[in-house]
Amino acid sequence: MYTITKGPSKLVAQRRTGPTQQQVESRLGELLKCRHSAPTPQHPRAQPPGPWPLSSPGPRLVFNRVNGRRPPATSPSLEGTQEPYTLAHEENVRFVSEAWQQVEQQLGGGPAGESGPRPVQYVERTPNPRLQNFVPIDLDEWWAQQFLARITSCS
């Protein structure tokens, strides 16, 4: 049998806190002022369809506290350190690296007279016409350009 508790549950009783409407409006005013005073880019690109323009950051993630507890404080020295790799991880990386080098050698000609199965490189017989004008983009370069544009537009 189920029992019904009196009063609201802890989940319902917790209130949401966030910036006040005045803080939101002042921040919006600052961003709009910064955008209107920004110079136009030399190479204008079409904006992809979506809820945010390219120059604005994506939505901010907000994590709520569990049971009203604060998250454990992290020291700044721990944030910059890398996670230590396990021996199994290093062994897997070494195995994949050696296997890939072996495949590259066999594709490049490799030792002559070696019998047995060789790797086969996939070549598409009927290329997709939509991909005829496809140009790959360097994401690191693109993000660097966006970062520099943001810095120059707000300074």
UniProtKB/Swiss-Prot annotation:
The modification N-acetylmethionine is found at M1. The modification Phosphoserine is found at S56, S77. Residues 46-56 have a biased composition (Pro residues). The modification Omega-N-methylarginine is found at R35, R60. Residues 1-59 are annotated as: Disordered. It holds the Pfam family FAM195. One of its GO terms (cellular component) is cytoplasm. The keyword Acetylation applies. Transmembrane segments: none annotated. It is found in: Cytoplasm, Stress granule; Nucleus. Keywords: Acetylation, Cytoplasm, Methylation, Nucleus, Phosphoprotein. It comes from the Eukaryota. Interacts with DDX6. Interacts with MCRIP1. Belongs to the MCRIP family. This is MAPK regulated corepressor interacting protein 2. It comes from Bos taurus (Bovine).
